């Protein structure tokens, strides 16, 4: 089982047992000390929402960061059967009691989605929600006015269909995307191709052009 220990304070990631993968949450890590990192720009993105997150939402984001890191850093090809990985994740949260009550359910969901074995050890001391940026000319905030839902958008046709369905139902979605190093440069191309396909085949959804 691969042990991963996460913390937003890099000083808490020293002197861990051999074989443990230390991961600096919302920071830059330390190459010299072999401390990995994830989400160093995430807190800035959260601040740009212009709203203060509650602790439960922040904890959910922290768990998502940990799951993404584990899935990224531990390769399937290095496992005994070339597929199933086993993770033991130690993670600080703002309100660990809430997630401790749902730990088994979370582990089962991730096992179903990934085919991997997940074990979580939640404890106190998690990253608190950052103070949002205030509206000013220097900082561009995400425009959440009149938005009533969130939709994942990769730039491909599958996620575009999800956007179309929401718009046809009268919703106004915020589109959320993610890219890894190497494919970010291709996303504008995929997004533009998606727009062309949608606007050609769904002329009644011209308003979609303003959402992508």
Question: Model segments located where?
Answer:
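Hydrophobic/small residue at the entry helix of a nucleotide-binding pocket
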Residues: 157-159
